[in-house]
Amino acid sequence: MNNLLTLVISAALVSGAATAPNARPKVSLHSATKSEIAEDINEQLIADIEECRTELDQLAQNNTLTMKSFDNLMKETLAAYHKEKSLSKEDVLTILDGVSFATKKHDGQTRKNTEKTPYISHPLGVAVHLMEIGKVRDVNTIVAALLHDTVEDTKTELAEIEKQFGSAVAGYVKEVSDNKSLPAQERKRLQVINASHKSAVAAQIKLADKLYNLNDLLNNPPSDWTPTRIDQYFQWAKSVVDRLPPSNENLELAVQDCIDSYWASQAP
């Protein structure tokens, strides 16, 4: 068993508590033995997680941010399964299937940041925000977050998602997908107009998505984005999230804090 996965599982077994996105779990790599893990979590489930992580590691070319996001997602998932009993074994396997599906679909795509981070880091990060900050434990919401850009940005049909993950997940993905046949400015305008009509699940995914993108702009913006363009994105993002129906107070506050911090940093 690799050390990172042992750390993830140990954190889930020992604490079951969410940590700050950048905080390392304060547990020893040896705080849970393999036999204890096998008894409490299931040996085959561990093997499935390791297989998914290996696939991701290969396609993401061992990108640090991507692998950290996966490990954080697994920490939250295993805590929900083992400690909270809020996710079933089948739910964990479905989340792993979602990671694998999204990883393959986004293979070769990168973010617009200067480091050209593998794109899969984004849906993983959105799912982590839902679980860590939003305390979301609904498996369909988590999987829809993992797949939220597959229809919009890859050659994926909703029917394919429905066949593998069900109509609920496909419906949520449809709700949060833009029509890429429209010009970018029109898509942004429609996001503002349509925000108030989103379901609570779609609203939560939108909040986590915007939170990830806003933080990414602060920490690793595209090289060709001017300060004015970043300002405009923050203004537009606020227009969208302010119109979303109430859905998750923790995520709403996190997005607002991010926006407020940005404008405070821009003050003369």
Residue map of PLM features:
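Active-site helical microenvironments for divalent-metal-assisted chemistry
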Residues: 37-268
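Classical Sec-dependent N-terminal signal peptides that target proteins to the secretory pathway
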Residues: 1-23
